[in-house]
């Protein structure tokens, strides 16, 4: 019987959530891509074909693939879920009471398939057939968005992350991604796969304003044996780490959290862009950023109510070794000379998805790093990524494990 549990980064991967890039990418243009957190526009059809190859590779490894669009359609079939999502996303404060009422009614009358496509892919004023007496639509240009597209939903890793016996519904840092979390909140509450199941919601499943307590799943590595490794990047804050750690400790789901202070720039927007877990004792690391002297803290529970001890750790590798009971980690650095390594890290060479110990999925374009992995005994299942890689995310970024074995 399948279960909702992720016990490691490297145990057998059994079930995963992906999101095929479609309508949202068609709304991505040179003039809006930076606001939507992309560096460039992607060839939509080619990106979809590359994503299909990624999903196919997972299925060939006996991994069950769930697709976000399908789950959202099936969730919207629950009337309470549909009403909640529209009330949450089409609020009076966001649109004004008159236009919000008119827009909600228009969306309520859509079939579930069409509504899911709009919620994920966006809607421009030029595509809106209804008239409203509100001022707001009269003041907008035709190509302005009524509902902003969510192209970053491609990166299902970030919006929610499963940690041992529960899930964190992450308060996202960037406004362009904050609506994503509500889709996962609805799915985990009402979709038949999750409704009534026994799992913990650690953090983020309420209607609070989280201020500076941001967490994104690309910074969260479930390294196993009760330990969690979290990067404090440009997207995850110390406040977010401590809130998540407190919830994990209170639930009895983690024995320690190792927090690493990362440089705050785009090339390492998340920990998993510079470091991933490939085998029980093996990590991929981009050494230009992941220096041994990065400020690191070890958080452990103090009592049973979520309080914690916080102590400095002077070497994150030693902290990981201690947590996993290993004498020494095996570190594989990004391949090629300094120029090639920088290029390949930028193209997600370190952002691989482990499907079982010593077997990972990564982009075929990163030839120097893939060769280095192979020589170190790591099998790389390569997938095309010339278009997907331009979104600044690799196989780990594009996947949210929902079921994975312990180590």
UniProtKB/Swiss-Prot annotation:
Q: Which GO terms describe its cellular component?
A: cytoplasm
UniProt-annotated catalytic positions: 397
Q: What is its main location?
A: cytoplasm
Any single Pfam family the record assigns to this protein: ADI
This enzyme catalyses:
L-arginine + H2O = L-citrulline + NH4(+)
Keywords (A to Z) from UniProt? Arginine metabolism, Cytoplasm, Hydrolase
SUPFAM superfamilies in the record: Pentein (SSF55909)
GO terms (molecular function) for this protein are: arginine deiminase activity
Q: Could you tell me where this protein is found in the cell?
A: Cytoplasm
Please give the pathway this protein is involved in: Amino-acid degradation; L-arginine degradation via ADI pathway; carbamoyl phosphate from L-arginine: step 1/2
Instruction: Give the signal sequence positions.
Output: none
* Claim: Translocase is one of the keywords in the record: no
Query: Which processes are annotated in GO (biological process)?
Result: arginine catabolic process to ornithine; arginine deiminase pathway
EC class, as a word, reads hydrolase
Cross-referenced InterPro entries, in alphabetical order? Arg_deiminase
Q: What is its EC number?
A: 3.5.3.6
Q: Which family does it belong to?
A: Belongs to the arginine deiminase family.
Its recorded name reads Arginine deiminase
